[in-house]
Amino acid sequence: MLAFCRSSLKSKKYFIILLALAAIAGLGTHAAWSSNGLPRIDNKTLGRLAQQHPVVVLFRHAEHCDRSTNQCLSDKTGITVKGTQDARELGNAFSADIPDFDLYSSNTVRTIQSATWFSAGKKLTVDKRLLQCGNEIYSAIKDLQSKAPDKNIVIFTHNHCLTYIAKDKRDATFKPDYLDGLVMHVEKGKVYLDGEFVNH
């Protein structure tokens, strides 16, 4: 019972910290909460969260070539030239606050290309489990985090994965655009959704 109370207090303390950081972020140019009910976590807030514990950030891939009139980078199942530029811009902004992270993607051309342009040369590990978007993705996240418990993780995956996680963890309706993301963390073997990443 005592252990449970301590765990509960720790979780409440973390949630209060998250709310405070979100409120601080909300004093800037955007609201602290998205219309879907998820806390909005910008680059600076994410950097502060990462000082509390390692974070796991999941991004949808960049602009998909076969669903756009923009010029393709190469393979039609991959991303557009505009998508590469957007991914690189996002990566530069992200790395300014979190320079050290392990990088993963699902085994599709569009996620691999997005991660490659995002990272600007960082080692990428492709994991086919990140294409599966039920409870399997939680097992994959916990496994990746267990390999390097003190490292931040960036994962490039798909819109239906992000939609599933938001609904499952917070009963939120999340319809991610290209390169939209979610912020999570793993604590004592459980995966928690902290909020929606916003690039500001």
UniProtKB/Swiss-Prot annotation:
* UniProt name for this protein: Lipopolysaccharide core heptose(II)-phosphate phosphatase
- What family name appears in the similarity comment? Belongs to the phosphoglycerate mutase family. Ais subfamily.
Give the taxonomic lineage as stored in the record. Answer: Bacteria, Pseudomonadati, Pseudomonadota, Gammaproteobacteria, Enterobacterales
Q: Which domain of life is it from?
A: Bacteria
Q: Which GO terms describe its cellular component?
A: periplasmic space
Q: Name one GO biological process term.
A: lipopolysaccharide metabolic process
Q: Which residues form the signal peptide?
A: 1-25
Subcellular location(s) per record: Periplasm
InterPro entries with a match to the protein in the record: His_Pase_superF_clade-1, His_PPase_superfam, LipoPS_heptP_Pase
User: GO MF terms on file?
Assistant: phosphatase activity
EC number(s) of the enzyme? 3.1.3.-
Keyword entries, A-Z = Hydrolase, Periplasm, Signal
- Return the CDD domains for the record: HP
Instruction: Provide the function of this protein.
Output: Catalyzes the dephosphorylation of heptose(II) of the outer membrane lipopolysaccharide core.
Pathway given for this chain reads:
Bacterial outer membrane biogenesis; lipopolysaccharide metabolism
